[in-house]
């Protein structure tokens, strides 16, 4: 444990951020998994709805700094390509 007061505070804030980031990333994985399942089943309408929801989650994660904005863009384009292949 740190002896400096500011570092003790940083440890606490880092832990809170780590837990938030973990939660956001977990929900991203779940959203992407649901989209991929819809694509594999061939349900284009459901996949289209899930693409919008997943893209929104990716954008939110990028704006909060959980993932990089380019990573969000790359994932969104890959999901859109998968939808267009149906």
Swiss-Prot record:
Gene3D superfamilies: Ribosomal protein S20
Keywords: Ribonucleoprotein, Ribosomal protein, RNA-binding, rRNA-binding
Example of a GO biological process term: translation
Keyword Manganese: no
Keyword Protease: no
Record GO cellular component, one term: cytosol
Xref: InterPro entries: Ribosomal_bS20, Ribosomal_bS20_sf
SUPFAM superfamilies named among the record's database cross-references: Ribosomal protein S20
Pfam families listed in its UniProt record: Ribosomal_S20p (PF01649)
Function: Binds directly to 16S ribosomal RNA.
PANTHER family the record matches: 30S RIBOSOMAL PROTEIN S20, SMALL RIBOSOMAL SUBUNIT PROTEIN BS20C
Full protein name: Small ribosomal subunit protein bS20
Lineage, opening ranks: Bacteria, Bacillati, Actinomycetota, Actinomycetes, Mycobacteriales
